[in-house]
């Protein structure tokens, strides 16, 4: 389970996916499978959470990694490149953004 902690020195990645309600569940299932079967087993993975809005038009993925390079290496694996091509067909687009924890209240 992700924990947002002041002083976390790892890499936080928040990815938003935009889709239609017609593809929302299929996309969520693909993301859940990717985490269960591949991502959580990658070096440097700390934790992640998947969230869907009530209109089923957006998914937000919050993930934590020990280092930026660990996240980038996961994206470059053959398995994730193949999975991301499929994921891309189920959404209008997705955008991963790297963040640093600045404050926790």
Name each model feature, range by range.
Residues 11-18, 47-77:
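Short, well-ordered beta-strand segments in beta-rich or mixed alpha/beta enzyme
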Residues 18-31:
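Short, surface-exposed ligand-recognition loops at beta-strand->loop->(often short) alpha-helix junctions
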Residues 23-25, 69-71, 104:
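Residue-level signal for secondary-structure boundary sites
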Residues 24-25, 35, 52-55, 60-62, ...:
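Alpha-helical interaction segments
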Residues 13-15, 27, 42:
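Residue-level signal for functionally critical sites in structured catalytic/ligand-binding pockets
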